Amino acid sequence: MGVSKIESTQASTYIDDIHDKVTRASNVIVPLSPISVFAARSPWARLEHKSFDEIAHWLKETRKVDMYPARMTILEANQKGEIDDAYVEQFFQQWLNDTALKIPRENAAQYGRNALKLETLETPTDIKSQLEALVSDLNEQVKFESENTVPLKSTYILDEKNERLIDTVDYHTIKWCKLYIDDAQSGWTMPNRDKGLFYAWRRLVAYDPALTKDQRARLKSLPNEAEDLMQQALSYLNISEADAQTYLENHLLSLPGWAGMMLWQDEHNHKVHDLLFSYLAIRIAMEWAIVEPYLPVSQPEDLNDMNKEELIASWIQWGNFSMQSWKALSIEAQQAHIQFAYRFNEQFCRKLWLDAWEATYNQQLKAMIGPKSSVEAEQQSQTLVQMAFCIDVRSEPFRKHIEANGPFETIGIAGFFGLPIEKAELGKKYSHPSLPVMNQPQHKIKEYTHEHEPNAFQQRKHALESVTYTFKKMKQNVLPSLLLPELSGPWLSLQMFTRSFIPKSVGSVIRKFYTSWLKKPNDTALTLNYEPQHQHNHRHIHLEDDLPVGFTDEEKVNYALQALKLMDLTDDFAPLVVMCGHGSQSANNPYAASLDCGACGGAASGFNAKVLAQLCNLPEVRQGLLQEGVAIPETTIFAAAEHQTSIDTLTWIYVPKLTEAARNAYENIEAAMPKISYQANKKRLSQLPNNNLTNRNPNHEVYRLTNDWSEIRPEWGLAKNAAFIIGQRELTKQSDLAGRAFLHNYNWKNDENGTILENIIAGPALVAQWINLQYYASTVAPHYYGSGSKTTQSVTAGIGVMQGNASDLLTGLPWQSVMSADNKMYHSPIRLVVVIQAPQAFISRLLENDETFKQKVMHGWVRLASVDEDNHWHEWSNEVKKFS
């Protein structure tokens, strides 16, 4: 693409409130956490003040990123019966009725119906010359308005090799980010790293051999302070104050992964300050230094120009116009028809198809859920075990198998169990926030042993860490690295052979090693009681913050009461109540954290389950609960377990002394668990692409998959998630939800003021929405919001993955998490529908009180339906507008 010269513009331009503009610009990205604590986030979480469709249009215009499902994805879903054609016609007619048309309705209807077939537009070669002449005449007589954008200078300036200079800017940006962010992976760290990114870059860039002498000189001429440097570079690039924020946004959107990591560091690492500002200052300075020889330039006039030839051709193909009938239209009519086609483009067609897809799923879900049989009440009174599972969609089919195999009741609640804690596990160097990422921990709970001297577990743990540390240091140093292959070669070769050909056996050996040689002491305990800071020294836990350790007596009762109310368990207690966290097992999987509990910030949630179970067993807590109207029988015992989602087993992590009734219940669930696991694994294996695995023993096969380091898909994770159902279990117990629904228990009759519902919406429902939109984004725009194929990923700097050595830090899910084969989707990219079992008055009150949730529904980021007290289904997408 050529560029045209304009007059020199290196006059000084000062942009007011540049820090505020950077802060506002950062809303176009989201923080990207290190992959070891991968937590699902909606890539559009900070843009929900605008509608889904507005952001889709904006991204298409500015980044060429499509937020709607692809044409082939829609056609495949339609063929599979996931989209009802009647809804497509319904939404099209509704749009025609609501739109002020400037062309005859019959023309619009005919064009629209043909365009909605999503057929490829083909322009006959014999009319191309006539189209060119028509467009030439139109351009002389009519001025068509196009989008007003502020693209980066480097996106439309080409170098001598006819390559865009933005690629060079990205290359240098990535290089400096990798050097700075490096998480103790390299033996020789970036000089001056401890003084901040900008300071280190400023000292080193003058010696960068990848830059030309002139480029280094230009950078050296810029000011030494980040703000002054950014101001000067923007001035040299001729960016006005009015365009500054948009220009900053485009820089952030060029590499949203690396920018997101800088933003995450700003928000979570107290050792850094203004890291995102430094990132932008460096990037803009690099851009100016690279494009300066080509300045001054003007933006090409055709950058955002509509393709009028194609639009006229679309009327000939889909509007059944001939060239003669088109020419017979007046200039004004031609302009109106072109504008209609420009608006009713393929992206808009796919938007209507998405609406129809979601409406079809709503209708299917409506038909599945409803009142249950009268036998339910009798079964409830005979329940032996009540098991509270995370709302995770993988829990739903597992819960169904449990309920079918005995007098067992299951309950849904977010996996952090309402506990705002940071956990410090025995043997771990660092603590981890074990709650949704949008919340901050209020307490630290530590796991410790009663022994005051270092015990065998600690010694063995340190010994293993020493071996790993020594191996790493030998790799990083020049002389020892020459000797390392001779020493480690035979052992690593043996490991490679065994893990490749007998993964299940090797995995079994490794598990036995960790469960025996590295088994935690039996006397481990949790710091549930509040402790002053000076008592922490003997715990052998590194503290990174000043959070209070443990709970006060009042807090213990409050958190236990809150959790029991959230799961609607305040009476009719079974002899055994089990809090079930969940985690996942897989080998050689950088995305292992994405398979753990999203409500615990990308970590297994068994720790939270154990904390709550122990709280509920404390006599003083039960006494406090009794004063609040919750009477737990003396025969009821709380225990904790962890659901391993990749092998569908239940691992007990806390079983106190049991009463006779609780012991009987425990033995019943233990006896049923092998059959439950077998059934659950068989069902889950049948859904994997290589479904001939079900011909083998399911339990053996899942262990092989989780231990095979070449396995790209040990489980489907949360793929196909589509609904968040808030209501009693009776609403869904007899329904086959196909592992697509988050299930949270709720009884509106016990929530007179609506506080419980508001808490569910503000916490668990938000987590579910973020998970849903991350899967959605990774499916519809895998090149931008996904992370490519697992087989070609490389873990970078210990904090994320890249494709190759010069890509963005990838933000989303790998291809194997959402697709079952090339060009064949597995995840259905539809937006989450929240279904609430409550009277309409409850929903109205929720929308009036919760402005954030109302905005999500109104702007199309989440859908809302309800089931009232008479089991009638209500859609709220249009009703919500009444509350604005």
From Swiss-Prot:
The cellular location(s) given in this protein's UniProt record come to:
Cell membrane
Matching InterPro entries, A to Z? DabA
The protein's organism comes out as: Staphylococcus saprophyticus subsp. saprophyticus (strain ATCC 15305 / DSM 20229 / NCIMB 8711 / NCTC 7292 / S-41)
Question: What are the alphabetically sorted keywords of the record?
Answer: Cell membrane, Membrane, Metal-binding, Transport, Zinc
- Keyword Zinc present in the record's keywords: the answer is yes
- Keyword Cell cycle, does the record have it? no
Q: How does it sit in the membrane?
A: Peripheral membrane protein
**An MF annotation (GO) of this entry:** zinc ion binding
Q: What is the name attached to this protein's record?
A: Probable inorganic carbon transporter subunit DabA
Principal localization reads membrane
Q: Which family does it belong to?
A: Belongs to the inorganic carbon transporter (TC 9.A.2) DabA family.
Q: Per its database record, what is this protein's job?
A: Part of an energy-coupled inorganic carbon pump.
